[in-house]
């Protein structure tokens, strides 16, 4: 567990029995939803996003805890989710297949980061790369 140390890559997710994020295709699990979080082409490939605000650029994250969406933040931290924990990952822990970049909309109330594929790859390979980061996410204990 780690204390919040300012900016980084944060995501609120459900904790599994083993103390790591739950894998799955949902907004509060470690995974990406095809057609929602990223859009595969007709051949099932995903590509490095342009990181345009509002586009489906990949795994949705935030640069600070305060920028996480209220529906995902744990109740005890002032959010509305009774099941989530706040997690942090270092950009260097993403691996060569993934890239993170801020893609905040100009008039947005909160800032946003997406973790997308670093190049062209089949969707399933991208999903595996995201889920392979599971052990790299650390729980944040104080905000």
What residues fall within each predicted segment?
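NAD-dependent ADP-ribosyltransferases
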Residues: 1-143
């Amino acid at each position: 567990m780690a204390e919040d140390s300012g900016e980084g890559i944060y995501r609120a997710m459900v904790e599994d029995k083993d103390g790591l994020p739950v894998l799955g295709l949902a907004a509060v699990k470690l995974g990406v939803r095809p057609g929602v979080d990223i859009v595969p082409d007709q051949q099932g490939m995903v590509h490095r996003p342009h990181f345009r605000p509002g586009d489906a650029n990949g795994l949705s994250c935030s640069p600070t805890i305060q920028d996480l969406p209220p529906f995902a933040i744990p109740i005890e931290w002032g959010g509305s989710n009774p099941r989530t924990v706040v997690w942090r990952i270092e950009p260097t822990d993403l691996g060569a297949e993934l890239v993170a970049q801020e893609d905040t909309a100009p008039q947005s109330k909160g800032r946003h980061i997406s973790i997308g594929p670093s190049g062209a790859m089949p969707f399933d390979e991208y999903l595996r790369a995201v889920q392979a980061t599971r052990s790299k996410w650390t729980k944040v204990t104080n905000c």
